[in-house]
Amino acid sequence: IVQHQLYWVIHIIKIEYMCEQKMNGKIKNQTILCILDGWGISKVTKGNAVKLAKTPNFDYLLYNFPNANLITYGPSVGLPKNQVGNSEVGHMNLGAGRKVQMDLPRISQAFSNNFLAENKILNSSIANINKRNGAIHIIGLCSDGGVHSHEDHIFELIKYLKKNNLRVLLHMILDGRDTSPKNSLNNMKKIKFLFGDLDFIASISGRYFAMDRDQRWDRTEKFYRTIVYREGEKFDDPETFIKKQYSKEINDEFVKPSVSINYSGIDYKRDGVIFMNFRSDRMRQISHALCDENFNNFFTYSKPI
Protein backbone atom coordinates (compact mmCIF):
# COMPACT_ATOMS: atom_id res chain seq x y z
CA ILE A 1 0.00 0.00 0.00
CA VAL A 2 2.77 2.40 0.95
CA GLN A 3 4.61 1.71 -2.31
CA HIS A 4 1.48 2.48 -4.32
CA GLN A 5 0.94 5.67 -2.33
CA LEU A 6 4.49 6.82 -2.96
CA TYR A 7 4.18 5.88 -6.63
CA TRP A 8 1.16 8.15 -7.02
CA VAL A 9 2.75 10.93 -4.95
CA ILE A 10 5.71 11.00 -7.35
CA HIS A 11 3.46 11.02 -10.39
CA ILE A 12 1.20 13.73 -8.94
CA ILE A 13 4.28 15.87 -8.38
CA LYS A 14 5.34 15.31 -12.00
CA ILE A 15 1.85 16.12 -13.35
CA GLU A 16 1.53 19.29 -11.26
CA TYR A 17 5.01 20.33 -12.35
CA MET A 18 4.15 19.93 -16.04
CA CYS A 19 0.78 21.71 -15.70
CA GLU A 20 2.41 24.61 -13.90
CA GLN A 21 5.01 24.93 -16.62
CA LYS A 22 2.39 24.97 -19.39
CA MET A 23 0.03 27.41 -17.67
CA ASN A 24 2.44 30.02 -16.37
CA GLY A 25 5.76 29.27 -17.89
CA LYS A 26 7.10 29.43 -14.33
CA ILE A 27 7.76 26.86 -11.63
CA LYS A 28 6.18 27.62 -8.27
CA ASN A 29 7.57 26.09 -5.10
CA GLN A 30 5.21 23.36 -3.93
CA THR A 31 5.36 21.03 -0.93
CA ILE A 32 3.53 17.80 -0.17
CA LEU A 33 3.59 16.52 3.42
CA CYS A 34 3.20 12.73 3.29
CA ILE A 35 3.25 11.08 6.75
CA LEU A 36 4.08 7.36 6.77
CA ASP A 37 2.98 6.29 10.24
CA GLY A 38 5.44 3.74 11.67
CA TRP A 39 8.03 4.13 8.91
CA GLY A 40 11.26 4.31 10.90
CA ILE A 41 14.96 4.49 10.07
CA SER A 42 17.33 1.80 11.31
CA LYS A 43 20.36 -0.09 10.06
CA VAL A 44 19.10 -3.26 11.74
CA THR A 45 17.59 -5.64 9.18
CA LYS A 46 16.29 -8.47 11.39
CA GLY A 47 12.55 -8.02 11.84
CA ASN A 48 12.71 -4.67 10.05
CA ALA A 49 9.95 -4.70 7.43
CA VAL A 50 11.00 -1.33 6.01
CA LYS A 51 14.60 -2.42 5.52
CA LEU A 52 13.69 -5.84 4.11
CA ALA A 53 11.04 -4.61 1.68
CA LYS A 54 11.68 -3.49 -1.88
CA THR A 55 11.11 0.26 -1.81
CA PRO A 56 12.13 1.68 -5.22
CA ASN A 57 9.94 4.78 -5.01
CA PHE A 58 11.07 5.67 -1.51
CA ASP A 59 14.69 5.01 -2.51
CA TYR A 60 14.20 7.29 -5.52
CA LEU A 61 13.09 10.14 -3.27
CA LEU A 62 16.03 9.68 -0.90
CA TYR A 63 18.54 9.53 -3.75
CA ASN A 64 17.23 12.46 -5.79
CA PHE A 65 16.07 14.95 -3.17
CA PRO A 66 17.60 16.51 -0.02
CA ASN A 67 16.63 14.70 3.17
CA ALA A 68 17.25 14.69 6.90
CA ASN A 69 16.28 12.60 9.93
CA LEU A 70 13.87 13.62 12.71
CA ILE A 71 14.13 12.28 16.27
CA THR A 72 10.66 11.06 17.21
CA TYR A 73 11.16 9.95 20.83
CA GLY A 74 12.31 11.36 24.15
CA PRO A 75 12.86 15.05 24.93
CA SER A 76 12.93 16.00 21.23
CA VAL A 77 9.15 15.53 21.11
CA GLY A 78 8.32 16.51 24.69
CA LEU A 79 8.64 13.06 26.26
CA PRO A 80 10.91 11.77 29.07
CA LYS A 81 14.37 10.48 28.19
CA ASN A 82 14.26 7.20 26.19
CA GLN A 83 10.43 7.18 26.16
CA VAL A 84 9.24 5.83 22.81
CA GLY A 85 7.13 8.06 20.59
CA ASN A 86 3.75 7.27 19.07
CA SER A 87 1.42 8.60 16.41
CA GLU A 88 -0.29 11.16 18.66
CA VAL A 89 3.05 12.57 19.83
CA GLY A 90 4.41 12.77 16.28
CA HIS A 91 1.30 14.42 14.87
CA MET A 92 1.12 16.90 17.74
CA ASN A 93 4.71 18.07 17.28
CA LEU A 94 4.43 18.20 13.48
CA GLY A 95 1.20 20.16 13.66
CA ALA A 96 2.57 22.64 16.18
CA GLY A 97 5.83 23.08 14.30
CA ARG A 98 7.72 23.05 17.59
CA LYS A 99 8.46 20.82 20.55
CA VAL A 100 5.31 20.25 22.60
CA GLN A 101 5.55 19.13 26.22
CA MET A 102 3.35 16.01 26.31
CA ASP A 103 0.94 14.90 29.04
CA LEU A 104 3.21 12.16 30.42
CA PRO A 105 6.10 14.40 31.61
CA ARG A 106 3.72 17.20 32.61
CA ILE A 107 1.77 14.89 34.92
CA SER A 108 4.96 13.34 36.30
CA GLN A 109 6.22 16.84 37.08
CA ALA A 110 2.93 17.70 38.79
CA PHE A 111 3.22 14.64 41.04
CA SER A 112 6.73 15.65 42.06
CA ASN A 113 5.46 19.18 42.84
CA ASN A 114 2.99 18.02 45.51
CA PHE A 115 0.02 18.23 43.14
CA LEU A 116 -2.10 15.70 45.05
CA ALA A 117 -1.85 17.43 48.42
CA GLU A 118 -2.82 20.75 46.82
CA ASN A 119 -5.76 19.40 44.79
CA LYS A 120 -8.86 20.68 46.61
CA ILE A 121 -11.37 18.65 44.59
CA LEU A 122 -9.51 15.39 45.17
CA ASN A 123 -9.05 15.99 48.88
CA SER A 124 -12.67 17.01 49.33
CA SER A 125 -13.72 13.75 47.66
CA ILE A 126 -11.35 11.78 49.90
CA ALA A 127 -12.87 13.37 53.00
CA ASN A 128 -16.44 12.64 51.86
CA ILE A 129 -15.69 9.02 50.96
CA ASN A 130 -13.94 8.50 54.30
CA LYS A 131 -17.00 9.85 56.11
CA ARG A 132 -19.20 7.37 54.24
CA ASN A 133 -16.72 4.55 54.94
CA GLY A 134 -16.45 4.01 51.20
CA ALA A 135 -13.66 3.10 48.80
CA ILE A 136 -11.88 4.64 45.83
CA HIS A 137 -11.95 2.57 42.64
CA ILE A 138 -8.95 3.30 40.41
CA ILE A 139 -9.48 2.39 36.76
CA GLY A 140 -6.52 2.64 34.40
CA LEU A 141 -4.05 1.00 32.06
CA CYS A 142 -1.37 -0.38 34.39
CA SER A 143 1.54 -0.13 31.98
CA ASP A 144 4.89 1.55 31.49
CA GLY A 145 4.10 2.07 27.79
CA GLY A 146 3.45 5.77 28.34
CA VAL A 147 0.98 6.14 25.46
CA HIS A 148 -2.36 6.15 27.30
CA SER A 149 -1.15 6.15 30.89
CA HIS A 150 1.83 5.34 33.07
CA GLU A 151 1.89 2.95 36.00
CA ASP A 152 4.04 5.38 38.02
CA HIS A 153 1.12 7.83 38.14
CA ILE A 154 -1.21 5.08 39.36
CA PHE A 155 1.28 4.03 42.03
CA GLU A 156 1.74 7.61 43.26
CA LEU A 157 -2.02 8.04 43.60
CA ILE A 158 -2.39 4.75 45.47
CA LYS A 159 0.37 5.79 47.89
CA TYR A 160 -1.38 9.07 48.57
CA LEU A 161 -4.80 7.50 49.07
CA LYS A 162 -3.44 4.84 51.41
CA LYS A 163 -1.59 7.56 53.33
CA ASN A 164 -5.00 9.19 53.83
CA ASN A 165 -6.41 5.91 55.19
CA LEU A 166 -8.65 5.33 52.20
CA ARG A 167 -9.62 1.87 51.01
CA VAL A 168 -8.25 1.47 47.48
CA LEU A 169 -9.54 -0.95 44.83
CA LEU A 170 -7.54 -1.23 41.62
CA HIS A 171 -9.24 -2.26 38.39
CA MET A 172 -6.11 -3.27 36.54
CA ILE A 173 -6.27 -2.93 32.77
CA LEU A 174 -3.51 -4.90 31.05
CA ASP A 175 -1.60 -3.52 28.07
CA GLY A 176 0.25 -5.92 25.75
CA ARG A 177 -0.02 -3.50 22.85
CA ASP A 178 2.22 -0.56 23.71
CA THR A 179 4.37 -3.00 25.70
CA SER A 180 5.45 -6.60 25.17
CA PRO A 181 2.48 -9.01 24.93
CA LYS A 182 3.21 -10.63 28.30
CA ASN A 183 4.30 -7.86 30.63
CA SER A 184 1.64 -7.80 33.35
CA LEU A 185 3.54 -10.07 35.75
CA ASN A 186 6.30 -7.46 35.81
CA ASN A 187 3.70 -4.79 36.61
CA MET A 188 2.41 -6.94 39.47
CA LYS A 189 5.91 -7.45 40.84
CA LYS A 190 6.27 -3.66 41.07
CA ILE A 191 2.93 -3.41 42.87
CA LYS A 192 3.92 -6.10 45.35
CA PHE A 193 7.30 -4.44 45.94
CA LEU A 194 5.70 -1.03 46.59
CA PHE A 195 2.65 -2.10 48.61
CA GLY A 196 3.51 -5.53 50.02
CA ASP A 197 0.65 -7.47 48.44
CA LEU A 198 -1.84 -7.59 45.56
CA ASP A 199 -4.96 -7.82 47.72
CA PHE A 200 -6.38 -4.49 46.52
CA ILE A 201 -6.51 -5.63 42.87
CA ALA A 202 -10.28 -5.91 42.46
CA SER A 203 -10.45 -6.84 38.79
CA ILE A 204 -8.22 -7.58 35.81
CA SER A 205 -9.05 -6.97 32.15
CA GLY A 206 -7.22 -6.74 28.87
CA ARG A 207 -7.44 -3.39 27.09
CA TYR A 208 -9.25 -5.10 24.19
CA PHE A 209 -12.36 -5.07 26.39
CA ALA A 210 -11.83 -2.18 28.82
CA MET A 211 -10.50 0.38 26.34
CA ASP A 212 -12.54 -0.04 23.17
CA ARG A 213 -13.11 3.27 21.35
CA ASP A 214 -15.01 2.12 18.25
CA GLN A 215 -18.48 1.64 19.79
CA ARG A 216 -18.13 -2.11 20.08
CA TRP A 217 -20.27 -1.87 23.17
CA ASP A 218 -20.33 -5.60 23.83
CA ARG A 219 -16.68 -5.35 24.89
CA THR A 220 -17.28 -2.34 27.12
CA GLU A 221 -20.31 -4.03 28.66
CA LYS A 222 -18.24 -7.08 29.67
CA PHE A 223 -15.82 -4.83 31.54
CA TYR A 224 -18.65 -2.77 33.05
CA ARG A 225 -20.53 -5.80 34.35
CA THR A 226 -17.32 -7.16 35.87
CA ILE A 227 -16.42 -4.06 37.87
CA VAL A 228 -20.01 -3.19 38.86
CA TYR A 229 -21.71 -6.59 39.31
CA ARG A 230 -18.74 -8.97 39.80
CA GLU A 231 -19.55 -10.95 36.65
CA GLY A 232 -16.87 -12.96 34.87
CA GLU A 233 -14.21 -15.44 35.91
CA LYS A 234 -13.12 -15.24 39.56
CA PHE A 235 -9.52 -15.26 40.76
CA ASP A 236 -7.90 -15.67 44.16
CA ASP A 237 -4.31 -14.73 43.35
CA PRO A 238 -3.68 -12.28 40.46
CA GLU A 239 -0.27 -13.72 39.52
CA THR A 240 -1.58 -17.28 39.37
CA PHE A 241 -4.51 -16.05 37.28
CA ILE A 242 -2.20 -14.37 34.74
CA LYS A 243 0.01 -17.44 34.48
CA LYS A 244 -3.12 -19.45 33.75
CA GLN A 245 -4.00 -17.05 30.91
CA TYR A 246 -0.51 -17.36 29.44
CA SER A 247 -0.76 -21.15 29.56
CA LYS A 248 -3.85 -20.81 27.33
CA GLU A 249 -1.91 -18.54 24.92
CA ILE A 250 -3.94 -15.50 25.99
CA ASN A 251 -1.76 -12.39 26.06
CA ASP A 252 -2.34 -9.34 28.26
CA GLU A 253 -4.38 -7.39 25.72
CA PHE A 254 -7.03 -10.10 25.37
CA VAL A 255 -7.52 -11.26 28.97
CA LYS A 256 -11.28 -11.35 29.58
CA PRO A 257 -12.61 -9.14 32.40
CA SER A 258 -12.26 -11.13 35.63
CA VAL A 259 -12.82 -10.31 39.27
CA SER A 260 -11.27 -11.07 42.67
CA ILE A 261 -13.21 -13.46 44.90
CA ASN A 262 -12.96 -10.84 47.67
CA TYR A 263 -14.41 -7.97 45.63
CA SER A 264 -17.99 -6.91 46.41
CA GLY A 265 -18.63 -4.50 43.52
CA ILE A 266 -19.16 -0.73 43.37
CA ASP A 267 -21.29 0.84 46.09
CA TYR A 268 -22.83 3.80 44.30
CA LYS A 269 -23.86 5.50 47.56
CA ARG A 270 -20.44 5.43 49.22
CA ASP A 271 -17.65 4.84 46.68
CA GLY A 272 -15.80 7.02 44.19
CA VAL A 273 -14.03 6.32 40.90
CA ILE A 274 -10.84 7.82 39.46
CA PHE A 275 -9.85 7.19 35.83
CA MET A 276 -6.07 7.25 35.43
CA ASN A 277 -5.56 7.29 31.65
CA PHE A 278 -4.35 10.71 30.55
CA ARG A 279 -5.34 10.00 26.95
CA SER A 280 -9.12 10.17 26.87
CA ASP A 281 -10.13 8.35 23.67
CA ARG A 282 -10.05 4.82 25.07
CA MET A 283 -11.59 5.70 28.45
CA ARG A 284 -14.58 7.53 27.00
CA GLN A 285 -16.93 4.55 26.61
CA ILE A 286 -16.50 3.06 30.09
CA SER A 287 -16.60 6.50 31.75
CA HIS A 288 -19.93 7.24 30.01
CA ALA A 289 -21.33 3.90 31.15
CA LEU A 290 -20.41 4.64 34.76
CA CYS A 291 -21.12 8.37 34.92
CA ASP A 292 -23.58 9.49 32.24
CA GLU A 293 -27.22 9.74 33.36
CA ASN A 294 -28.40 9.50 29.75
CA PHE A 295 -26.27 6.50 28.81
CA ASN A 296 -28.26 3.99 26.72
CA ASN A 297 -25.77 1.91 24.73
CA PHE A 298 -26.42 -1.08 26.97
CA PHE A 299 -28.64 -1.65 29.99
CA THR A 300 -27.33 -0.55 33.39
CA TYR A 301 -29.23 -1.29 36.60
CA SER A 302 -27.58 1.23 38.87
CA LYS A 303 -27.64 5.01 38.82
CA PRO A 304 -24.49 6.76 37.58
CA ILE A 305 -21.70 7.13 40.12
Question: What is each stretch, according to the model?
Answer:
Residues 19-32, 40-208, 218, 305:
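Active-site nucleophile/metal-coordination loop of metallo-enzymes that catalyze phosphate/sulfate
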